[in-house]
Amino acid sequence: MTGEGSATILLGIDPGSRITGYGVVDVATPTPRYVASGCIRIKSDQLAQKLAQVYAGIGELIGLHRPHEIAIEQVFMSKNADSALKLGQARGTAIVCAANHGLEVFEYAPTQIKQAVTGTGAATKEQVQHMVTAILGLDGVPQADAADALAIALTHAYARQGRSLPPSRGRRRSGSRQRWRDYRPS
């Protein structure tokens, strides 16, 4: 089920041991189209059960949306070693689930994702949410983990097209251009 040149449905995953965000986009046309997003909320305190819930949730998403490729965020260095280890375990669980479904997995660093979606690798979560909403033409702002997962899927879409930055999706007003340093979340 790998997508060699014909992949149109991409699943982005923002792994976590408590909340795993997901975002599904269709890239059949040059402009990515929103399909779905949300969060897998982990209800257990036991590690094995947490990982089983991540695996089951990702498996359910794969069955429902039939993605051709999966993109996931790479582990970033954390000051808290325990948190980084738990994140790595959740991430590994998602990768194994994808592999067991015959899907190719693509990995992107957090700074690559922010750069691709916002134009700067130092973007805040709010800036990522704002740009994901604008790029996909969403009516509302997705929850942070879901927005991150959509940003991961968009990053993969842009990488597949050989682009590093997204095209402008909003109407451009003459004489006005929004800059990130001017953006203030509501």
Curated annotation (Swiss-Prot):
Binding site for Mg(2+) 1: 14, 145
GO molecular function: crossover junction DNA endonuclease activity; DNA binding; magnesium ion binding
DNA damage listed as a keyword: yes
Keywords: Cytoplasm, DNA damage, DNA recombination, DNA repair, DNA-binding, Endonuclease, Hydrolase, Magnesium, Metal-binding, Nuclease
Pfam name, any one: RuvC
Catalytic reaction list: Endonucleolytic cleavage at a junction such as a reciprocal single-stranded crossover between two homologous DNA duplexes (Holliday junction)
Cofactor binding annotation: Binds 2 Mg(2+) ion per subunit.
Active site per the UniProt annotation: 14, 73, 145
Any one GO CC term of the record: cytoplasm
Assembly and binders: Homodimer which binds Holliday junction (HJ) DNA. The HJ becomes 2-fold symmetrical on binding to RuvC with unstacked arms; it has a different conformation from HJ DNA in complex with RuvA. In the full resolvosome a probable DNA-RuvA(4)-RuvB(12)-RuvC(2) complex forms which resolves the HJ.
Function recorded in the entry: The RuvA-RuvB-RuvC complex processes Holliday junction (HJ) DNA during genetic recombination and DNA repair. Endonuclease that resolves HJ intermediates. Cleaves cruciform DNA by making single-stranded nicks across the HJ at symmetrical positions within the homologous arms, yielding a 5'-phosphate and a 3'-hydroxyl group; requires a central core of homology in the junction. The consensus cleavage sequence is 5'-(A/T)TT(C/G)-3'. Cleavage occurs on the 3'-side of the TT dinucleotide at the point of strand exchange.
Protein name as annotated: Crossover junction endodeoxyribonuclease RuvC
Gene that this polypeptide is encoded by: ruvC
